């Protein structure tokens, strides 16, 4: 009579665990916002100079593709990153507000923008903490903190802890994820 080893299923278990670890390290592109919880959210409006209630923006991938450029769609909906120094706002010094290119939510003020030397527009803080969401991003075997738009859940960029005073933070954004509105317009 053959003895069955208690380790017989071990190779299969190791393969399953390895697959979970490997594929768990790659965040899947969100694309559609159909999973977003619709409803009113409290956000800051630069135009109003205070907090307002706003509805979340929920669209299908097809709807997003109709209103965004291919580059904007890749960055906002598929968590892409534009090439360093290729974005129109990397070296911009004009005064105004940077909004989400997907839904128009106010995100950053030019007064909080600084030259980080990275090739992407960088800010020390958002216009209001309520206007963004941060979450862990472990894609490509890196540990980062992703920044997304609170209203449409579009990927904006990442935040790092190597920024200047007073916050010590560097909100490194993609130009294609932003829309600039000059002061007085």
Language-model features, listed with the residues they occupy:
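Bacterial signal peptide processing site
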Residues: 26-28
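N-terminal export leaders
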Residues: 3-8
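C-terminal motif of bacterial Sec signal peptides marking the signal peptidase cleavage site
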Residues: 21-24
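Short, contiguous pre-domain boundary segments
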Residues: 39-60
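A short Gly-Trp-Pro
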Residues: 56, 65-67, 79-99, 105-185
